[in-house]
Amino acid sequence: MTAVGSGTGLAATFATEVRTRLDRIATLAADGGLDEAITLLTEAIEAGAVIQAFGTGHSEAFAMEIAGRAGGLIPTTKIALRDLVLRGGYEVDTLGGSTMERNPNVAEDLWSVSTINPGDVFVIASNSGVNGSIVGMALLAKQHGHPVIAVTSLQHTRAVEPKHPSGQRLCDVADVVIDNLAPYGDATLALRQAHDAALTGGVPVGSVSSITSAFIAQLLTIGIAERIAATGAVPPLYLSANIPGGDEHNSGLERRYEGRIRRGT
């Protein structure tokens, strides 16, 4: 972490931390799994399959960047823990806190209420890469013959113990691993204050995994669209629903994937 004091320089320092990571992700695309993931996902879409995006906690934001948004690909589905409440008979209270995302046993139930077909590819995001539901879903996908792409912090996941009974991390299960370059603990800045004697390294602030993971999601989408367009085909992309003709455009393309994609909450 970068140690900083309070003041107006915090924004500039954080911007530097973010920019440095985004530049590295873009520069290392070929060696960091991004190009391999784009190839895998493009081939799946061209074969009529769907991208299954999954994340828990703040990593659900990654799945939201992949599935069902303006400028995003239409053959995508977001899997979320709340699906167990909406379709699996779980009580609403079970969503509180982090108990559910750490529970490896929910993966089977979540799989049973999801729309998954042969050939679909899973893209699973988890900064820590060790929670039970995340690793459990990755293992289930592999058991059913689906490729798995992981978006995770390699620095963080290698520094913590796995929580899944298998002893595996998300990066151990995945076919392709993309490092979101977040540091251990996610925060990039250590804010020094006179009253924080108990926190000798400073107060951790300025988390970056959501930003870098969203960037990765967009690079994946752009790369897939570019590959499809290069063949002369029109990439199946959403328009904003809040522009004239957006709903009609989107509905028409969604009908091609009827029964294979699901737009949830």
Name these PLM-found stretches:
Residues 1-28:
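Generic N-terminal amphipathic, Lys/Arg-enriched alpha-helix
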Residues 4, 8-11, 31, 38, ...:
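Amphipathic, non-membrane alpha-helical segments in soluble helical-bundle scaffolds
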Residues 9, 13, 28-32, 98-101, ...:
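Short, surface-exposed alpha-helical recognition segments that flank or form part
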Residues 26-46:
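A short, well-structured juxtamembrane/interface segment
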Residues 30-37, 51, 229-238:
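Flexible, glycine/charged-enriched surface loops at secondary-structure junctions
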Residues 46, 53-222:
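Glycine-rich phosphate-binding loops that contact phosphosugars or nucleotide phosphates
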Residues 70-72, 224-265:
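Active-site phosphate/pyrophosphate-binding segments
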